[in-house]
């Protein structure tokens, strides 16, 4: 069965791309009777507040028609930001050599929260170097992944 995130990605990719943006990813946070749908958009020129507002209107219209979410929800549209979340193998691949943190569904090396350097991505397998040791992580075991911003 497809996750709500994957159904939303399938539903919203074309409308977001029609506006000239890339659908970077979607987070669905279910909190009791109220949920949050976070839609991340990106573009080579960057994302401005007007872009988020325009995308929010378009996404809201699609969600109103398709009605994939049965609970009350808040829609948030933003850029991925400097600590951008990572959703796909291609996104992890693009950030090889960068520091990242991942929250896992099942522990790896005794931990569900890891910080390290993205070493390699092969298919749906991520290699994360944590304290000098390469850890192999299946992408479907990652609940949440983010780049660690360097300042």
Curated annotation (Swiss-Prot):
PANTHER family to which the protein is assigned, alphabetical: RIBOSOME MATURATION FACTOR RIMP (PTHR33867:SF1)
A GO biological-process term: translation
Keyword terms, alphabetized: Cytoplasm, Ribosome biogenesis
Listed name of the protein: Ribosome maturation factor RimP
Main location: cytoplasm
Gene: rimP
Organism encoding this protein: Shewanella denitrificans (strain OS217 / ATCC BAA-1090 / DSM 15013)
Family, per entry: Belongs to the RimP family.
Function summary: Required for maturation of 30S ribosomal subunits.
Keyword Cell division part of the UniProt annotation: no
Phylogenetic classification of the source organism: Bacteria, Pseudomonadati, Pseudomonadota, Gammaproteobacteria, Alteromonadales
Subcellular location, record wording: Cytoplasm
Matches recorded under InterPro entries: Ribosome_maturation_RimP, RimP_C, RimP_C_sf, RimP_N, RimP_N_sf
GO cellular component: cytosol
